[in-house]
Amino acid sequence: MLPESFFLHDDVLHLAKELLGHILITKISGKITSGFIVETEAYRGPDDKACHAYNYRKTKRNSPMYSRGGIAYIYRCYGMHSLFNVVTAKQDLPHAVLIRAILPYEGEDIMIQRRQWQNKPKHLLTNGPGKVCQALNLTLEHNTHALTSPHLHISKEKASGRITQTPRIGIDYAEECKDLPWRFLLNIKD
């Protein structure tokens, strides 16, 4: 698994790109599921109007972002979907990387069951941040968990491929920050 030191890099854009191709692994209720990280978005606390911690705003919900890098920041979006972020950087520098999509690697049958995705297109199984959490069974219960534990971690192994960079999705409220190309996608089929 990746060591804690990997997550302490202050450049969240670098880490958002660097996480691509690594395998996100969960072992929850005795069931192992995993997938290659193929889409990420960087959120840079102090100066990013799309970030929950913009201008060093601190709330009960976003307080995990102020922790030392290497923990999970999971929150509810629209009160419905859990979204999984990797907290990065040193203590009190609120950066995080949203894991937007994975490519199933292990336990795909379990993911299909968790998402009730039988007889549906497999390429849509984990192609969104809420879908990732549902497929891997990540909930608010896993918020602040270390990413160096047997039940939640990211592998050292890494797949390669073509990386593209685009603006982030669904942040029209973020004024000039909405067009920053801080979304990274990995095509490992090339």
From Swiss-Prot:
Listed InterPro entries: Formyl_transferase-like_C_sf, MPG, MPG_sf
Disulfide bonds: none
Tree of life domain: Bacteria
Single biological process term from Gene Ontology: base-excision repair
E.C. code: 3.2.2.-
CDD domains: AAG
Pfam families reported for this sequence: Pur_DNA_glyco
Tagged with keyword Hydrolase: yes
Keyword Protein biosynthesis attributed: no
EC class of the enzyme, as a word: hydrolase
MF (Gene Ontology): alkylbase DNA N-glycosylase activity; DNA binding
Entry keywords, A to Z: DNA damage, DNA repair, Hydrolase
Family as reported in the entry's similarity comment: Belongs to the DNA glycosylase MPG family.
This protein's name: Putative 3-methyladenine DNA glycosylase
Native source species: Chlamydia caviae (strain ATCC VR-813 / DSM 19441 / 03DC25 / GPIC) (Chlamydophila caviae)
